Structure formats: C-alpha cells, structure tokens
A protein has these predicted regions:
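Nucleotidyltransferase catalytic core that binds NTPs
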Residues: 1-250
Length: 250
C-alpha cells in the first residue's frame, strides 16, 4: 500500500459571499484526512470561480477575494487558489482539474462537492468526466433529503451516455477507467485510488445558502437579517455592510 506524497483537497464555488457552511465543509474534510493520513501533507484550498455559467455574479472578483481572505484569516491550514480567477470566463471545473492533474501528477486530488452540486453534474460542462481527473468527496445537504441509494448506478448511466457522445471526438481517452466510478466507505480507501472514486460523507452541512444571505441581509424582517448575520464570519459580515454589497436597488 503506497501512501500519496501529498493530498490536495479543494472546495470550489462562487463564494458570493463565503459563509460558515463553506468553512465547516472544508475544515471537516481537512481534519478527516488528517486523521486518516497523519503522516501525509494535506493541502486544503478554496477555489473561487471566475463566473459560473449557471449563476449570476453580484460582486467583483476582487470583492470576493477580499471576503475570502477575511474569512480564512485565522484558519492556518486553509488558503485560496486563484487559478480560475486568472482566466477569462466561462471557466469550467473540468479544465481546472485537468490543469491540476498535470501540475501535480504525483498527488492525490480530492474535489469537495455538496449534495446540491453533485445532483447537478449533468448540467456541468463534462461534469461526469470529473471522475477521470479526481476523486469526489460528497457532503449531504439536509434540505435536499437523502442522497439516492442508486447514486452509483445513476452516475454509471450518465458516464456511459457521456462516453458514447464523446468517444468519436476523443479516441485517446481511457474509457474503461472513466466508466468505473466506485463509492468508497472510508477516507482510508482513497489510498492508491487517484481517480474515479466517490466518498459520501455522513457529515451534515448546515443549511446555509449564499443566495439566502444576499436576500436576507437587508431584509425588513429582523429574523432574516439576524439569520444572515449569524451565517457569516463576523469579518465578512462587517465587510458586506461597510461596502453595501447585495444592497437592493433603490
């Protein structure tokens, strides 16, 4: 059993704004990996998107970066990867992870996804091909109900359909490897599994969404304003209010 030299774990997102659930997700994965692999370097990064084709962008890249920096200022194991921000949108996770695979060929890559994201992989650019580049670490969201027991079968079906659609255009792709997504039951099972594996965590992500924070932070209802404030790192909340981010048009 060969230990990886380094494990690189990243959580991507628009982070508009970053909130406490984001931080709890990446912190949980980092600490689980530290327990599973105490003698391996674990590098955890937040990967802000340049602009999602599936979302509008209320703030600038610089403002999002400043909020991220404030949010992780006292989190020593966490840093920001600006790879996607250095590219012109649209930028796709498939291309970013392809670059990471070339940049770090000997490292174990893990891409963290919430349940809401993994259930929309069919809408992502070459979404199901991400498994050919990385392992996925999936975290459930309580508001969405239980993850399907047939997730492996569903992924397998989609991967087969995707392979049939692309095989003529990419004859050199390793179809066999790409069509064997395998759900593992422990982070330790990631040893020697550099791609194609999915770990479905039992850690329940707090039910916080950036879109709700944007809608509630200036709400006329005190309860919603308080919920928005309590969902954010205090420094990020102050930054948003100071710069009047997400303020409704007058």
């Amino acid at each position: 059993m060969t230990m990886p030299r380094c494990i690189r774990v990243c959580l991507g997102g628009s982070f508009d704004p970053i909130h406490l659930a984001h931080l709890q997700m990446i912190a949980h994965v980092y600490h689980e990996l530290m327990r599973a692999f105490p003698n391996v370097d674990i590098i955890a990064k937040l990967l802000p998107t340049a602009g999602s084709p599936l979302k509008t962008q209320p703030t600038s890249n610089q403002q999002r970066l400043e909020m991220l920096a404030l949010a992780i200022g006292d989190v020593p194991f966490l840093s920001i990867d600006e790879t996607e921000l250095q590219c012109q949108p649209p930028v796709y996770s498939f291309h970013t992870l392809s670059e990471f695979k070339q940049r770090y060929p000997n490292d174990l890559l893990i891409f963290v996804l919430g349940q809401d994201s993994v259930e929309q992989l069919d809408k992502w650019y070459r979404g199901f091909e991400l498994l050919s580049l990385t392992n996925l670490w999936v975290l459930p969201r309580p508001a969405l109900g239980s993850l399907s027991r047939n997730l492996s079968h569903t992924l397998h079906q989609n991967l087969n359909q995707n392979a049939l659609a692309t095989i003529d255009k990419t004859p050199s792709i390793n179809i066999d490897n790409r069509l064997v997504p395998f759900i593992i039951h422990s982070p330790k099972d990631l040893i020697n599994q550099t791609t194609n594996h999915i770990y479905i965590d039992k850690f329940v992500v707090p039910d916080i969404a950036s879109r709700d924070i944007r809608a509630w932070i200036y709400s006329t209802e005190a309860r919603q304003r308080q919920q928005a404030r309590l969902s954010l790192p205090s420094q990020v909340y102050r930054y948003i209010v100071e710069h009047q981010l997400y303020a409704p048009d007058v």
